[in-house]
């Protein structure tokens, strides 16, 4: 199982490490795992792995559009700033998301979870309603997946964007 966590722009580090591993393997990273899971930025990375989108593409997205995707906000430095940042995390999504949506649409198009090449699990939380949902590919016969869900919509639900709350 490859499990990838969130962390906003800090996900660039994980993306770089995964891209280097993928490059050294000489094949898509997803072929080495039975299940791929991720939340928030880890969800984006997990989708890339599950769909065999080269991780170098995600690294480029972070490097070229990271400031727009993450609102150009730096890391919280002081105690008060960290508390305000935590409050924003609890009361709603931190980021607007239109730039990210446009970029994801460009790479994933109208692909659905059924199009994933590898088993995938994306837990999502609607923080405004305290509702959780686990989106998944139909990788277990007894468990219905969310195969009709568009990838772009799932990544938006995954803790990032206001408009997607209704999907949870």
Regions found by a protein language model. Name each.
Residues 89-91, 101-109, 148, 159, ...:
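Contiguous domain-boundary segments centered on the initiation and propagation of an alpha-helix
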